[in-house]
């Protein structure tokens, strides 16, 4: 037994652990505890980063929804404004067409009135000439009556023309 190398190896192993076991145990457990603390710290950091990432994702989703709502509101306002502008342009075009139509009708009425006045003036001139011819031919037999009627007719002619023109 004392000459067996296995005995001495086992005794050296046991003595080594009895003498240095506590120090080795403290060093190994200290290293393992430090490693566990490091892993725990890394896990806490990862959890914190995950919470931050989730918060950032929620913020980004909220911002995206807010931006989408604003965009839709802007689009609706733009469509309403475009419809209003189109309606206003349509009304302006209708008003312009109505103004042009009224101006054309006014011109037509003015031309009609002018033509009627010209016809009335010409008819009055023809009537006066015809009356003069008739009166002069019929009253040649009696010169006094003819002169009196012609003078009265000529004197009343401007007033009669004014009445017919009005």
Curated annotation (Swiss-Prot):
The chain crosses the membrane at residues 7-29. CDD domains: ATP-synt_Fo_b. It is a single-pass membrane protein. One of its GO terms (molecular function) is proton-transporting ATPase activity, rotational mechanism. GO terms for cellular component: plasma membrane; proton-transporting ATP synthase complex. Keywords: ATP synthesis, Cell inner membrane, Cell membrane, CF(0), Hydrogen ion transport, Ion transport, Membrane, Transmembrane, Transmembrane helix, Transport. It is found in: Cell inner membrane. Pfam families: ATP-synt_B. F-type ATPases have 2 components, F(1) - the catalytic core - and F(0) - the membrane proton channel. F(1) has five subunits: alpha(3), beta(3), gamma(1), delta(1), epsilon(1). F(0) has three main subunits: a(1), b(2) and c(10-14). The alpha and beta chains form an alternating ring which encloses part of the gamma chain. F(1) is attached to F(0) by a central stalk formed by the gamma and epsilon chains, while a peripheral stalk is formed by the delta and b chains. F(1)F(0) ATP synthase produces ATP from ADP in the presence of a proton or sodium gradient. F-type ATPases consist of two structural domains, F(1) containing the extramembraneous catalytic core and F(0) containing the membrane proton channel, linked together by a central stalk and a peripheral stalk. During catalysis, ATP synthesis in the catalytic domain of F(1) is coupled via a rotary mechanism of the central stalk subunits to proton translocation. Belongs to the ATPase B chain family. HAMAP family: ATP_synth_b_bprime (MF_01398). This is ATP synthase subunit b 1. The lineage of its organism: Bacteria, Pseudomonadati, Pseudomonadota, Alphaproteobacteria, Acetobacterales.
């Amino acid at each position: 037994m004392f000459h067996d190398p296995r005995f001495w190896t086992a005794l050296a192993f046991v003595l080594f652990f009895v003498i240095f076991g506590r120090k080795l145990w403290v060093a190994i457990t200290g290293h393992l505890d430090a490693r566990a603390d490091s892993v725990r710290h890394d896990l806490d950091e990862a959890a914190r980063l995950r919470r931050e990432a989730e918060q950032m994702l929620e913020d980004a989703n909220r911002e995206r929804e807010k931006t989408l709502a604003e965009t839709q509101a802007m689009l609706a306002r733009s469509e309403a404004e475009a419809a209003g502008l189109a309606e206003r342009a349509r009304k302006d075009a209708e008003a312009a067409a109505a103004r042009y139509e009224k101006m054309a009708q006014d011109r037509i009425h003015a031309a009609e009135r002018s033509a009627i006045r010209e016809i009335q003036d010409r008819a009055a001139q023809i009537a006066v000439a015809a009356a003069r011819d008739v009166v002069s031919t019929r009253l040649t037999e009696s010169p006094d009556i003819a002169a009196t009627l012609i003078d009265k007719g000529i004197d009343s002619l401007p007033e009669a023309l004014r009445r017919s023109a009005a």
